[in-house]
């Protein structure tokens, strides 16, 4: 009897520790997460997703998009690049000094030391922070994903398998026209794409006077019969709204990087 009771107590204690570590701990750590400030700005991140994008999250979930895509960018580390912004009145001396210095791929301490040398010579510099890693080099995002990126997602669609590319920052890479065409005929937008077409998210309608503004520009064998057009359904519009809301292109305290220029224009066919 004593042995049975001891085993019960041991199992109960083990379960309590497991529950505390795997359930209570994460809830206490992440359950209080809130909006944060963009680095060096008073702007708040993230903004709540628009209504269509919130509905689109449920479409994304319903059709199992997370089975083939992740929304979490990884990162190995950061490097610092020192950039000369002004040579000052001793430009020749500064130029000669720079020719002897390593300016890229530095640690923070190395970058501070190099900047100090250039400043002492009369020049002015900026230190640019650049995230590194396989996902970064693929262009999937400028930094790693953090908890705040998923603040408004319930449930968060992290995914674990990458049959297709990561989508954490896809809203900064493509526009709505591209997304609709990619859903209808993936191969027309991505060469050798293995993604199945989602044509059931579109409908064929008779043209009423003029072509609808959201009609797909289909050609060749994909074109509808004369007098008809192919337009997205509400599910397609909401899904695309959600995909366009997936952006993590702002620097945060937990994931800094230097914004060198305004985002490039979204790709359009």
What are the functions of these language-model segments?
Residues 67-71, 125-129, 192-197, 250-259:
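Surface-exposed patches in mature extracellular/periplasmic domains of secreted proteins
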Residues 80-84:
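A short beta-strand micro-motif
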Residues 61-65, 70, 119-123, 168, ...:
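Sec-exported extracytoplasmic/periplasmic mature domains
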Residues 12-19, 85-89, 96-98, 104-116, ...:
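Electron-transfer interface patches adjacent to heme c in soluble/periplasmic c-type cytochromes
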Residues 53-66, 223-237, 250-258:
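Sequence context surrounding c-type heme c attachment/ligation sites in exported
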Residues 70-77, 199-209, 250-251:
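Short regulatory "switch" loops immediately downstream of catalytic or recognition motifs
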Residues 1-50, 131, 240-269:
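Post-cleavage N-terminal segment of exported redox proteins
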Residues 34-61, 67, 73-79, 109, ...:
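Electrostatic cytochrome c docking/interface patches
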């Amino acid at each position: 009897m004593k042995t049975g009771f001891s085993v019960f107590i041991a199992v109960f204690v083990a379960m309590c520790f497991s529950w505390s570590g795997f359930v209570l701990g994460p809830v206490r750590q992440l359950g209080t997460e809130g909006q944060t400030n963009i680095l060096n700005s008073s702007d708040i991140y993230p903004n709540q997703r628009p209504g269509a994008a919130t509905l689109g999250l449920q479409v994304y979930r319903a059709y199992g998009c997370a089975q083939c895509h992740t929304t979490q960018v990884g990162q190995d580390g950061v490097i610092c690049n020192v950039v000369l912004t002004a040579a000052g009145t001793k430009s020749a001396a500064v130029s000669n000094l720079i020719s002897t210095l390593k300016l890229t791929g530095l640690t923070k301490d190395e970058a501070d030391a190099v900047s100090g040398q250039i400043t002492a010579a009369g020049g002015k510099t900026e230190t640019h922070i650049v995230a590194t890693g396989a996902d970064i080099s693929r262009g999937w995002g400028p930094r790693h994903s953090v908890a705040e990126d998923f603040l408004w997602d319930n449930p968060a669609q992290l995914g674990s398998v990458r049959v297709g590319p990561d989508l954490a920052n896809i809203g900064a890479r493509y526009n709505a026209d591209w997304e609709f065409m990619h859903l209808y005929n993936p191969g027309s937008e991505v060469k050798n794409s293995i993604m199945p077409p989602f044509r059931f998210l579109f409908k064929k309608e008779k043209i009423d006077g003029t072509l609808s503004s959201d009609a797909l520009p289909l050609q060749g064998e994909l074109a509808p019969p004369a007098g008809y057009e192919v337009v997205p359904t509400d599910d397609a519009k909401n899904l695309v709204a959600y995909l366009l809301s997936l952006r993590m292109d702002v620097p945060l305290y937990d994931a800094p990087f230097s914004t060198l220029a305004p985002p490039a224009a979204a790709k359009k066919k």
